[in-house]
Structures are given as structure tokens and as C-alpha cells.
Amino acid sequence: MKAIVFAYHDIGCVGLKALVEAGYDIQAVFTHTDSPNENRFFSSVARVAADLDLPVFAPEDVNHPLWIERIQQLQPDIIFSFYYRNMLCDDILSSAPRGGFNLHGSLLPKYRGRAPINWVLVNGETETGVTLHQMVKKADAGPIVGQHKVMISGSDTALTLHTKMRDAANELLRDLLPKMKNASLPLEPQKESEASCFGRRTADDGAIDWQKSALAINNLVRAVTEPYPGAFSYLGQRKLIIWRSQPLDVVHSKLAGTVLSTSPLVVACGDGALEIITGQGEEGLYVQGSRLAQEMGIVTGIRLGNKPSQKLKRRTRVLILGVNGFIGNHLTERLLRDNRYEVYGLDIGSDAICRFLDNPNFHFVEGDISIHSEWIEYHIKKCDVILPLVAIATPIEYTRNPLRVFELDFEENLKIVRDCVKYNKRIVFPSTSEVYGMCDDKEFDEDSSRLIVGPINKQRWIYSVSKQLLDRVIWAYGAKENLKFTLFRPFNWMGPRLDNLDAARIGSSRAITQLILNLVEGSPIKLVDGGEQKRCFTDIHDGIEALFRIIENRDGACDGQIINIGNPTNEASIRELAEMLLRCFEKHELRHNFPPFAGFKDIESSAYYGKGYQDVEYRTPSIRNARRILDWQPEIALEQTVMETLDFFLRGVVLEQNVLEQNVLEQNVLEQNVIEQSKTSKDEHHV
């Protein structure tokens, strides 16, 4: 059986050797180049492949069309991934008739994602394991071929647990690979209700919070000790790294972080105390705890903690134009929750952001970007990150008001881009999935997909080309004027506060809002061209988390990047979306407040949108850039998003009805009182 292998790390070496022993015909091995900045404690897949006389490659982007073509030419029967760091695209996985299989370092569905060995130790788990599963679009979510359990002892560290996992992987693969070669093994679907997902860890995650229990801190030490950078704390400006420790069940009345003794070196925790067995200063030697106390001048009663700031760090100032919009108000909530940001916002309304108006880190002005140009320029100069979120982004307006779309979406935003260039400010610009137009790629890739639009007489493309031209202008300013920028492309973000029902009444809203209005009013749900168009819907909370990471921009990783933000696993036709919405509506607790369902009605696009409209059959994002740059993966299922969106609008309608009824009741009472008073006055006058 012909196999292609994607492998890295010790586990990759184990997998490669197991495949050879099982008699697989390995056509090629793909791995990663060894980074000089990485403390490499594991074996080299490239060396093992060379020793086995296997062709080995280490492309920067294995999902590039050139590499996809080369892989397809090899015509593999099956694909294996052993600790390879990148997701493989559908084109690669579909090139193997038997599919692709990945070895993951946990007992799936628990601990999907990055660094599972470190995370299980941080969280104090007593067991983990390895899982061989089929690869699907969603990371680590495919059906399971087999698992091997590994017990975690209280003395295990990341290194000792890694050794156990390597041995478990070897046993699992030696058992399964020969069977898979001869026949297809049964697959067990993962239980989504039991799934958990964890992101990457960095050296900064080793910072000790002494308020936590001694057990939790000791777990952190075990998880990041050698060969990792280690758990650390500070004595003033000096860094102290803890390599080995043990929790002590002692009762004390000291503040967390206080040194209780120096021989042994014991530090008070939020619950119990931690004995530092070995450690070192940042520039010192690896020594015993008591020796470390001597070398660093640690005395009983002194406190360890975070590194004191040289100066109080100013909050990052973020300017959001269109702050009251769907993305703007949700992003504001996320930024303010983090407490490292100060938000300045402008919009023509404030109904969605009234909940932030009392926050001292939120500053709002009601205004129009086409009028308040001086205010905007001043705040671009004042702020650090600029997000111009103002745009007309509803399809019916592209044909109904094409010139207004161009004036607002292109001309007004171009002024903002130029001010960012003028004052050397970073711009995070909302491109759109619409720029891909009628692209015929299976997945729309930021760096390689063609941007294809229709003829001039199809005016619906004015939005797409306005955004595309701004993308190109921003890119050119980056190349020629060193403008710092990131372009993000949302793919059908959806959730509470998306448009409003009043906008839906005049047809100026996105699909789900229009569908909800039909249900609320008891009118037929109109399915344009039968609702067969497919879209990949993304929960607003998933989307905002990705956008937050773009604004955060760790190590400048997002500078000069274009990033799709969408959920390829949440693909559904508009008809399927409507049917799902109807099911949620019928079982909602407020259903009795609304009329009976009036059915579906198919309608031609020209009758709904007018002449000049042209639709797209599908729009599926590649999210490799988002995974690689942001360490981001969408998690929220479509049905959950639909339920939350529906619930938001239904409760709003019922509340509005109750307020209206209360107002009518109060008015009736008032009128009745006036009548009674008038009658009393007449009676008194008569007397």
C-alpha cells in the first residue's frame, strides 16, 4: 500500500519506523526544518527518513497548489500524520482513496488542539493517551481508529510523560498499522459533548500565580520543566526559574508569594505552600533550593511575584468607526473585558453599545464618517490601532444603491487609509469574503485564489470590487509607504445583534435576520433561487476571538497578512439554514407568542434583489492562515449559533410587545382618570 507521511518529533520517528516495519510503500516524507531557536530534545524525522533512504521534503506551505499537485501525482493509497504541525487541506486528503489518519497525543475527544502533554499536567490529570483518528476538516475531530491509555503519576514531568507517550504510540501503531494495511478498520465517532480544546503554550505561560494552590503551581512546574523554558517568578527585577518542586500541606497566615523558609526554600501559596527543590536565577546555575536562596539573597519574609513594571503601561487605544454595528459592538465587549484596551468609537447610533457607555475605558461620539472627518483624523493620530468598520454590506443595497455603496465603502474609507499612512498608524481593515466572487477553487485561499467577478451590468459586484480595490491600495501602501496593516475577511458571521428586524422589513438585512422576521410576522420564508446557495456560517464569538488576536498581534505576526475568518465545517445552504431555524423556532419557549408558520416560497433572485444581481453557489474559506498565524480554530456549531440568534430576536420582540401593551394600558388608565376627574368637577359645580 502506497503511503505519504507527514511527521515531526519523536512520535514522527516512531510512526515512520512502524510504517516501514508494517510493509507500507512510503512514497514521500514531509517534515519541518529544525528551528535554531527551538530547544530540540527529540529525534529528527529527516535523519530517520534519510537513513531509510526515503525521499524527504520540508516545504514552508505544504498546502500550496504546487505541492498539492506533486502529492496528487504520487497517487497515495493512504496518508498518515504523526505530530506534523500543520493541518492538511482537503485536496491533499482526498488524493488518498483510503483517507488520511493522524496520531494525536491525548485520549480524544479530550484535549484537542496544541500541547496536550503540557496541558494534561497543568490541569492535574491522572491519565491521558494517544489516539489514531481519521482526519476531517475540523482539527482532531475525526472518527477514532484506536487508542492507548497512559497513566500519569504525581512525579511525571513533560519529559517523562513524553517518553511514556512515545512508547504508547509505538505499541498502538504496531497493533493497528498491519490491520489497516489489510482491511479497513471500524471507526468510532467522537462524542462532541465530551470534547475539549486547548491552544498553544508559550514561555510566558510559565509565569507563576502564587494565589493558586500549591498543587496547581506544582502541576505547572511539572508541565514546563526541562526541556521547556520552566515555571518562573520574580524577586524584584530578577527572574527565578523553578525546575523541580513539591506541594506541602501546611497552614499559614502569610500573603501568597511570601518566603516561609530558606532551608528548605518554601513559598506560601493561596492554599498550602511550595517547596522549591531545584531552580536557578536567569543568569545562574542549576542548584538546590537552599543554595538558590543564598545566591539570590532570598530571606524569610520576602515576597516573590510578578516583575515590577518599569513604568505603568498605557492601554492600547483602539479606534472603531462603526462601533455600534454587529462586529463593532461585539469587538468592543471583547476588548473592554481584556482590560488592556481603551476604545474610542464613532457611529450614527448607540442602541447596541449603550451597555458600555458607563465604562471609563470606552469613549463614544455619535456622528457620521462622511461629516466628522476632522474628529476622525484627530483620533487616528491619537490611537494605536484603527478599525474602519463602516460599510454597506447587505446584498440588496448593491443593486438598489450602487453609487452610495461605492461612496461609503470605498471613497470614505480611502480617506481613513490615507490618514493611517499620514500618521503611521496600524490599520486592521475589514475586507470581505465577497472579494473572491465566483472563484472556482474548492477553498478560497488568501494568497492564491483568483478574485473573479461578473460583467459590469451586474451591479451587485460593486461592493466586492470596492473592497478589493481598497485591499490592493492598502497592500500597495504597505509595500511603498511601510503602512502597518492586516486585512481580515469574515465569512458569514452570525449571532445576536446582527442587523435588526426594522432593517429586515425593508429588505436591508442579512439572510438569518430576514428569515427570523418571516417567522415573527407569520409570512412565508422566501428562498431566493430555491435557497440552494451554500455558505459557511461563523459564530460571532469565534469570529471576534480571531479578530481580537489580530488586534493583539503577538510578535507582529499579523503585520502585512490577509486572514480569512470563517468556519468551513459549518457549511449549509440557505434552505438548510431556514429549516434549522424553523426547528429551533418551533421548540422555543416563546413560540406561542407568534403566528403559525406560513411555509416556504421559492422566488427568483431578480424578483427579490432586482436587476443586476448575480449569486455565488458556494463560498468556503481556507483558514490555514488563521490557524498558523493566530493559533485559532472555530469551535461553535451552527445550530448553537442559530438558537442564540433566534433567542435574542424573539426576546426582543416579546419585550417590545410587552412595553407597548403596558403603554397602552397606562394610556387607557390615564384617559379614564381624566374622564372621572371631569365628571367629578361637573358634579361639584352642579352642587
Curated annotation (Swiss-Prot):
Region Formyltransferase ArnAFT, annotated ranges: 1-304
Source domain of life: Bacteria
Catalysis performed (reactions): UDP-alpha-D-glucuronate + NAD(+) = UDP-beta-L-threo-pentopyranos-4-ulose + CO2 + NADH; UDP-4-amino-4-deoxy-beta-L-arabinose + (6R)-10-formyltetrahydrofolate = UDP-4-deoxy-4-formamido-beta-L-arabinose + (6S)-5,6,7,8-tetrahydrofolate + H(+)
Sorted UniProt keywords: Antibiotic resistance, Lipid A biosynthesis, Lipid biosynthesis, Lipid metabolism, Lipopolysaccharide biosynthesis, Multifunctional enzyme, NAD, Oxidoreductase, Transferase
Residues engaged in binding NAD(+): 347, 368-369
Raises pKa of active site His, annotated site positions: 140
UniProt keyword Cytoplasm, yes or no: no
Sites where the protein binds (6R)-10-formyltetrahydrofolate: 114, 136-140
CDD domains (UniProt xref): Arna_FMT_C, Arna_like_SDR_e
Stretches for region Dehydrogenase ArnADH: 314-687
Site entry (Transition state stabilizer), positions: 102
The keyword Transcription regulation belongs to this UniProt entry's keyword annotation: no
GO BP field: lipid A biosynthetic process; lipopolysaccharide biosynthetic process; response to antibiotic
Family matches, as Pfam families: Epimerase, Formyl_trans_C, Formyl_trans_N
Pathway: Nucleotide-sugar biosynthesis; UDP-4-deoxy-4-formamido-beta-L-arabinose biosynthesis; UDP-4-deoxy-4-formamido-beta-L-arabinose from UDP-alpha-D-glucuronate: step 1/3; Nucleotide-sugar biosynthesis; UDP-4-deoxy-4-formamido-beta-L-arabinose biosynthesis; UDP-4-deoxy-4-formamido-beta-L-arabinose from UDP-alpha-D-glucuronate: step 3/3; Bacterial outer membrane biogenesis; lipopolysaccharide biosynthesis
One Gene Ontology CC term in the entry: membrane
Catalytic residues of the enzyme: 104, 434, 619
GO terms for MF: carboxy-lyase activity; UDP-4-amino-4-deoxy-L-arabinose formyltransferase activity; UDP-glucuronate dehydrogenase activity
Residue positions binding UDP-alpha-D-glucuronate: 393, 398, 432-433, 460, 492, 526-535, 613
EC assignment: 2.1.2.13, 1.1.1.305
Family: In the N-terminal section; belongs to the Fmt family. UDP-L-Ara4N formyltransferase subfamily.
Subunit description: Homohexamer, formed by a dimer of trimers.
This protein's name: Bifunctional polymyxin resistance protein ArnA
